[in-house]
A protein has these predicted regions:
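Short, contiguous alpha-helical
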Residues: 7-71, 112-172
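Helix-adjacent hinge/juxtasegments
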Residues: 64-105
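Short acidic-hydrophobic surface loop/beta-edge motif
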Residues: 108-110
């Protein structure tokens, strides 16, 4: 996989992650924090897990060791969560821009949270992060439907269409 393809995937996942936050931002704080029996509790827990995972993988790619999980309590509301996520994305974007194209195929050695050593090419780990977010956006959509909230589509084809429209507007 080429660096530009991975960059495109990362751009898409940022768009989709922020898009899924739109309906969440319309909820009450109680709805945002409610434990709904999902794998990470509810909306806040699932979104906090996504932010934590994005940060964890970025740290691994930079050669850092595992750290403690982000506590979902750090996010009293959607705004705090979005702000933290945006900061993580900015750091990831700056790191990614600094990569040489050949580096995406190089192996990354990292440790899982249980201390086991692993190794995989960087491009596979970036693909994993994008896929991981897609999986949890599906869970968020289900949780939103469970409480009767509006949902949004986060399909890549929609992102592609919107990008083409924006490009045409810039052209003229």
């Amino acid at each position: 996989m080429q660096k530009e393809d991975l960059g495109r995937l990362l751009e898409y996942t940022v768009w989709a992650n922020h898009r899924i936050l739109r309906p969440v931002a319309t909820l009450t704080v109680a709805e945002f924090k409610k434990d709904m029996g999902s794998s990470h509790g509810g909306l806040r827990g699932t979104l906090a897990h996504m932010v934590d995972s994005d940060l964890l993988w970025l740290e691994r790619w930079k050669g850092m060791s595992p750290r403690d999980l982000i506590d979902e309590g750090e996010f009293p509301d959607v705004v705090a969560l979005r702000d933290r996520w945006t900061l993580v994305e900015k750091h990831r974007d700056a790191w990614f821009k600094g990569l040489r194209p050949s580096e995406v195929s190089e192996p990354v050695q990292y440790k899982s949270r249980d201390g086991k050593s692993h190794e995989a090419p960087l491009y596979q780990l970036i693909e994993h992060v994008v896929n991981h977010s897609t999986y949890h956006r599906g869970q968020i959509t289900t949780l939103l439907r469970k409480i009767g909230a509006k949902t949004v589509a986060t399909d890549m084809v929609i992102w592609d269409r919107e990008a083409k429209i924006k490009a045409k507007r810039r052209e003229g």
